[in-house]
């Protein structure tokens, strides 16, 4: 809705829609608050069956576009690299690596360079504009998946800076990664804390939960299996079933 950038108070476009669909409860809540209309939740369809699962290695993975804080929807890669560096310096993470994957537009190259400088001297691998086969290989072989979108942001002032849903989280779970994600926005609707992953509110919690997983193969394996099962709730089949329910309730064909 680019016209909302010109005049956020002009909601006349809503008169041209019979129904509004939201991609999460988080989005629905803000549609209600900002637009004053009710929406139906329809989670995006994800091809979970296509995500490969291979022998897991001591890898932590984070995936998202490189966007500097204050510019847009930042995935907070810099903060995650710094947190991982802190974990490495404290010890007890022998053999573990962090892989940072994401697209990078020319305007964001200074931010990418900042992330790369923070990674120097650490077992951190930065993959800018990685091809899809490499991304899938990292999904398949990584053990833990990190998300920090929204860290340090104010939801009341800028709700768009948070994950409205979290497609890459579901993809990682389908590939058998244990998600350790920020306890904000759409991530809350995907990851059930202590059941199929963990949610955190501070970087100290992120480090503690990740360290617990890194040191406990049995726990990591159990949560990984639960994560794969949970990802099925967001499959294409689940999407079709949910859409049919919505269509029937609304009298649509």
Q: What label would you give each PLM region?
A:
Residues 102, 112-137, 141-144:
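Nucleotide-activated donor-binding/catalytic signature segment of Leloir-type glycosyltransferases, i.e.
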Residues 169-174, 178-181:
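Short hydrophobic beta-strand element within catalytic cores of glycosyltransferases
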Residues 1-20, 27-29:
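Membrane-proximal helix-turn-helix segments that form the acceptor-binding/catalytic region
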Residues 140-164, 177:
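Acidic donor-binding loop of glycosyltransferase active sites
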Residues 193-204, 212-217:
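Conserved acidic donor-binding segment of nucleotide-sugar-dependent glycosyltransferases
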Residues 201-205, 218-250:
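A charged, aromatic-enriched C-terminal amphipathic alpha-helix characteristic of glycosyltransferases
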Residues 33-37, 46-50, 55-118:
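Conserved catalytic-core segment of nucleotide-activated headgroup transferases in glycan assembly
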Residues 156, 181-194, 198-199:
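Short acidic/histidine- and often glycine-rich active-site loop of Leloir-type glycosyltransferases
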